Amino acid sequence: MWIKELELKHYRNYDHLLASFSSGLNVFIGNNAQGKTNFLEAIYFLSLTRSHRTRADKELIHFDHSTVSLTGKIQRISGTVDLEINLSDKGRVTKINALKQAKLSDYIGTMMVVLFAPEDLQLVKGAPSLRRKFIDIDLGQIKPVYLSELSHYNHVLKQRNSYLKSAQQIDAAFLAVLDEQLAGYGARVMEHRIDFINALEKEANTHHQAISNGLESLSLSYQSSVVFDKKTNIYQQFLHQLEKNHQKDFFRKNTSVGPHRDDLAFYINGMNANFASQGQHRSLILSLKMAEVSLMKALTGDNPILLLDDVMSELDNTRQTKLLETVIKENVQTFITTTSLDHLSQLPEGIHIFHVTKGTVQIDSDIH
């Protein structure tokens, strides 16, 4: 899939923008603080209904206005789809082909994106919440039912934690009802995650071995707070541990086990990647991003859109070449932001170059 056209109204520093793109490489050049990242964020937001930079929707609204509108024309294998998101003080409205979508899981996945931004380099050593978010964003696009089950899980988790904080003593019967619901949704969330990580590991290892010229292997491990011996009995094990932890959870006023506390670990040649070099970290993240692209295509039959936000300067020539080889080979529409073309020596011919200045975008008259 690829985005043919994007229109922004009152988005960040863009008062109004209407732009068309190549199905291949699109490079956005400009000085810092001109709107390059805002532009990629808009594509990301149109896809996922959320920003990767802020949780506050009001920060996305142009300072002179009270509403935001984003519309995009997406070319999928199945045909053209129009997406639309409108933000105001009354809330958010999402539409597909002008039809309002009641559920997030009905909208997300229509346009798939993979974002590679400088903050992704913190994925290995950062907080577990970053790695859970990484899983949730990818898996939610590939399998929308996952988002629905995760939403139900979080709703019951909030109820359980609220009860634990307010209760003066344990009501075992009431907790048992919540435990059964939480274990049911939580087990399905974990099953989806485990399947996803197993599939991602195969793709990521293939890319990582290519980047390292066969010198390194990459493995991934889903680290669950729920102890279980096989995937088929997660529900029973989860339920048992919830029941066993009633006193502890009551004392701590929160739920001590479940997918909300799970993590993801990375290993290079069997060694924990926390102890890897900076160069190895870059190779690992690059392998993951290329694996995301490959896996989304393998599981959905359609390519995602790749967003590279000021990361090419973080990669040496070898890693740049490997990334662009994958992009070209897989025919992935790609958006690259940069302050200069100096470190993009490996770019092929036929790219579209756009110049970004103070919230305006101008296509280069000469296609490179």
Curated annotation (Swiss-Prot):
The keyword Heme does not apply. GO terms for molecular function: ATP binding; single-stranded DNA binding. It is found in: Cytoplasm. It holds the Pfam family SMC_N. ATP binds at residues 30-37. One of its GO terms (cellular component) is cytoplasm. GO terms for biological process: DNA replication; DNA synthesis involved in DNA repair; double-strand break repair; SOS response. InterPro entries: DNA-binding_RecF (IPR001238), DNA-binding_RecF_CS (IPR018078), P-loop_NTPase (IPR027417), RecF/RecN/SMC_N (IPR003395), RecF_2 (IPR042174). The keyword Nucleotide-binding applies. Its main location: cytoplasm. Keywords: ATP-binding, Cytoplasm, DNA damage, DNA repair, DNA replication, DNA-binding, Nucleotide-binding, SOS response. Belongs to the RecF family. The RecF protein is involved in DNA metabolism; it is required for DNA replication and normal SOS inducibility. RecF binds preferentially to single-stranded, linear DNA. It also seems to bind ATP. This is DNA replication and repair protein RecF.
